[in-house]
Curated annotation (Swiss-Prot):
<feature type="active site">
    <location>
        <position position="505"/>
    </location>
</feature>
<feature type="binding site">
    <location>
        <begin position="146"/>
        <end position="148"/>
    </location>
    <ligand>
        <name>CTP</name>
    </ligand>
</feature>
<feature type="binding site">
    <location>
        <begin position="186"/>
        <end position="191"/>
    </location>
    <ligand>
        <name>UTP</name>
    </ligand>
</feature>
<feature type="active site" description="Nucleophile; for glutamine hydrolysis">
    <location>
        <position position="378"/>
    </location>
</feature>
<feature type="binding site">
    <location>
        <position position="54"/>
    </location>
    <ligand>
        <name>L-glutamine</name>
    </ligand>
</feature>
<dbReference type="GO" id="GO:0005524">
    <property type="term" value="F:ATP binding"/>
</dbReference>
<feature type="binding site">
    <location>
        <begin position="379"/>
        <end position="382"/>
    </location>
    <ligand>
        <name>L-glutamine</name>
    </ligand>
</feature>
<keyword id="KW-0460">Magnesium</keyword>
<dbReference type="InterPro" id="IPR017926">
    <property type="entry name" value="GATASE"/>
</dbReference>
<keyword id="KW-0315">Glutamine amidotransferase</keyword>
<comment type="function">
    <text>Catalyzes the ATP-dependent amination of UTP to CTP with either L-glutamine or ammonia as the source of nitrogen. Regulates intracellular CTP levels through interactions with the four ribonucleotide triphosphates.</text>
</comment>
<feature type="binding site">
    <location>
        <position position="139"/>
    </location>
    <ligand>
        <name>Mg(2+)</name>
    </ligand>
</feature>
<dbReference type="InterPro" id="IPR029062">
    <property type="entry name" value="Class_I_gatase-like"/>
</dbReference>
<feature type="binding site">
    <location>
        <position position="71"/>
    </location>
    <ligand>
        <name>ATP</name>
    </ligand>
</feature>
<dbReference type="GO" id="GO:0042802">
    <property type="term" value="F:identical protein binding"/>
</dbReference>
<feature type="binding site">
    <location>
        <begin position="14"/>
        <end position="19"/>
    </location>
    <ligand>
        <name>ATP</name>
    </ligand>
</feature>
<dbReference type="InterPro" id="IPR033828">
    <property type="entry name" value="GATase1_CTP_Synthase"/>
</dbReference>
Length: 537
């Protein structure tokens, strides 16, 4: 019998429900239970693909091409697993299916309503995934009380009734503020949030209380009394230095043990040794390197969450802490490359559109001319080709047709299959594709494989008509698409200390114990470069 753990949130958004859900998943997996995580997003968008990163953070891409919420990235990293597009349930998907069924006449003339038709479709989607697992953690996005999440909470309530109380548990994540004036933790917002949840027919089994400092005993007792939750199930999730500490904190607080007992599962000893080692290693790092990320969404760092995490993974493997210098690409256009002075490495991440493109190109030139360890990703890969064409091959005005359709040298062009599309959503080259790597290259030394699968999200590519000229001038295309060798995937400059760019997004497959090879290589090169600089000064 599959066990379900629903994670809801109250008081305010952005409390870390995603990290809490990922941590619960890890605690169950560490006990030897076959576990997966589902994210419910109550927005009406079908998927996260067309959303502005400023509103929603990065769009995470899965192997099957699903463009999903960044929380699924956390689930994949914490559980070291590969999820599918079906693991992200949105209001848009649910309503689409129900409306399609109604049009096909599957409801036989019934009035189609939120209950039972929408709620039934939600339950069907959850159970469809649950078939292969012993434990399923379902995070319901938004805050209790939001109008959008009502059908999902109702579906969860019904599931407890249908599956039996021993098979469905509810964990409610709330916020316990501390008012400076009185210096005590206030439980009233939590009480009201649980009251709201109860009014929907859901009694939480555990409360994860988010706070700046550990939960005081008086606050714990009060929460327990007013929310009808045993004291042992009021979990103190205070702020920690790093998100990877959260599972260990929740385990120490007894959440894993409590949930196994509550769901009538055998309480096995969790195996978290590797995780503990990784966290201890990261916390012990003293040596640092500074890597610049030159992007167009840097005001919201969640826009580049997977890159931040991949750098963290590479920190552990290289025993050096990465400090990120966030640089707005447009600022490079106005203030020049002095903003990059002193960095040990430079990353140009993915992105779309003209804003900040020239600033990114200046940063690429600065990295190339000053031999600073460099990694370009997706749009960063394409702009590296543009920079090289302009400044090495002398192709004045060379550009991507995405930004300048009239460029005299369209070195980056729309892929042929993208030319006649009239829809934006879900139509890019998305998901895991094979990449063939040439032996004897930097890319090969990083991957040690001739064929790898990496995740993509793009419409434009290096124009095959310019490849010969670019290679003649010294640019090496060390990786090509496994399904079409005219499609370039990796480029490098062999005469530089570390200069590489990829059409794919390596950050999406990076894991805490297995950093993405190009990130590992970048941090290693940055560490060596900093040591060299220190010797010469």
């Amino acid at each position: 019998m599959t066990k379900y753990i629903f994670v809801t949130g109250g008081v305010v958004s952005g409390l870390g429900k995603g990290i809490t859900s990922a941590s619960i998943g890890l605690l169950m997996k560490a006990r030897g239970y076959k576990t997966t995580n589902i994210k419910i997003d109550p927005y009406i968008n079908y998927d996260a693909g067309t959303m502005n990163p400023y509103q929603h953070g990065e769009v995470f891409v899965l192997d099957d091409g699903g463009e999903v919420d960044l929380d699924l990235g956390n689930y994949e990293r914490f559980l070291d697993t590969e999820l599918t597009f079906d693991h992200n349930i949105t209001t848009g998907k649910v309503y689409s299916t129900v409306i399609e069924k109604e049009r096909r006449g599957e409801y036989l003339g019934a009035t189609v309503q939120v209950i039972p038709h929408i709620t039934d479709e939600i339950k069907r989607r959850i159970r469809e995934i649950a078939k292969d697992y012993e434990v399923v953690v379902v995070e319901i996005g938004g805050t209790v009380g939001d109008i959008e999440s009502m059908p999902f909470l109702e579906a969860a309530r019904q599931m407890q009734l249908e599956e039996g109380r021993d098979n469905v548990a509810f964990v409610h994540v709330t916020y316990v503020p501390k008012l400076k004036v009185v210096g005590e933790q206030k439980t009233k917002p939590t009480q009201h949030s649980v009251k709201e949840l109860r009014s929907l027919g859901i009694q939480p089994d555990a409360i994860v209380a988010r706070s700046e400092d550990p939960l005081e005993e008086a606050a714990r007792k009060k929460i327990s009394l007013f929310t009808n939750v045993p004291e042992e199930a009021v979990i103190s999730a205070y702020d920690v230095e790093d998100t990877y500490e959260v599972p260990l904190l929740l385990e120490r607080e007894g959440l894993g043990k409590y949930l196994t007992k509550r769901l009538k599962l055998e309480d096995r000893e969790p195996d978290l040794k590797d995780w503990e080692k990784m966290v201890a290693k990261y916390k012990a790092l003293t040596e640092t390197v500074e890597i610049a990320i030159v992007g167009k969404y840097v005001k919201l760092q969640d826009s580049y969450l997977s890159i931040k995490e991949a750098l963290k993974h590479a920190s552990v493997s290289n025993e050096v802490k990465v400090k990120i210098r966030w640089i707005e690409a447009e600022d490079v256009e106005t203030h020049g490359t002095k903003l990059l002075e002193g960095v040990d490495g430079i990353i140009i991440p993915g992105g779309f559109g003209a804003r900040g493109a020239e600033g990114k190109i200046q940063a690429i030139r600065y990295a190339r001319e000053n031999d600073i360890p460099f990694l370009g990703i997706c749009f960063g890969f394409q702009l590296t080709v543009v920079e090289f064409a302009r400044n090495v091959l002398g192709m004045k005005g060379a550009h991507s047709t995405e930004i300048d359709p009239q460029t005299p040298y369209p070195v980056v062009d729309l892929m042929p299959e993208q030319r006649n599309l009239d829809r934006l959503g879900g139509t890019m080259r998305l998901g895991a594709y094979p990449v063939k790597i040439k032996k004897g290259t930097l890319a090969y030394s990083l991957y040690n494989k001739e064929l790898v699968y990496e995740r993509h999200r793009h419409r434009w590519e290096v124009n095959p008509n310019y490849i010969e000229a670019l290679e003649k001038a010294g640019l090496v295309f060390s990786g090509v698409a496994g399904d079409d060798e005219r499609r370039m995937e990796i480029l490098e400059l062999p005469d530089k200390r570390y200069f590489i760019a990829t059409q794919f997004h390596p950050e999406f497959k990076s894991r805490p114990m297995r950093p993405a090879p190009v990130f590992h290589g970048l941090v290693r090169a940055a560490k060596e470069y900093k040591q060299e600089k220190n010797v010469t000064h």
